[in-house]
Amino acid sequence: MPEQSNDYRVVVFGAGGVGKSSLVLRFVKGTFRDTYIPTIEDTYRQVISCDKSVCTLQITDTTGSHQFPAMQRLSISKGHAFILVFSVTSKQSLEELGPIYKLIVQIKGSVEDIPVMLVGNKCDETQREVDTREAQAVAQEWKCAFMETSAKMNYNVKELFQELLTLETRRNMSLNIDGKRSGKQKRTDRVKGKCTLM
């Protein structure tokens, strides 16, 4: 499907095995898979409300491998918002996000007006290598938001994408999370007076 000019592009980065695909699939399809299948690059679409009209939230799930730097640079140049995922069970996965963050700053010039979320996934696991305060300190240094999630337990997954749109100050964004495409009437909640979950 070709990109539309009104697509809002979110790019998900992180090391292999941190749960990027699991977070995206949990959000878009409501499913979770236990088996690890490496991703080269997948794109998912979700209809959202944007500036009182309809646009498409396009989520690009990138490879955890460093074998495709040209794809990384292209994803960053086209991206409107970024989710940087690490596993709380792997300090190395947090450290590997540093060069990606620097590349985003290099390509975009500044991240002050760009929504960036640092996400500690697998927070349901007991064998942690990254303390919450440590990750919060990194997020503060990078001037980005931070959230812990569990794709497996469906903890903070919807909230992650809602918060990302809340951080978008250039447009008034609303997120349709109903994914079932049924004829049922959708309930609307106001979140922080700016974005709407439908």
UniProtKB/Swiss-Prot annotation:
Organism: Homo sapiens
Membrane topology: Lipid-anchor
One Pfam family this sequence matches: Ras
Location in or out of the cell: Cell membrane
Compositional bias ranges of the Basic and acidic residues kind: 178-192
Residue list for modification Cysteine methyl ester: 195
UniProt keyword annotations, A-Z: Cell membrane, GTP-binding, Lipoprotein, Membrane, Methylation, Nucleotide-binding, Prenylation
Name of this chain's protein: GTP-binding protein Di-Ras1
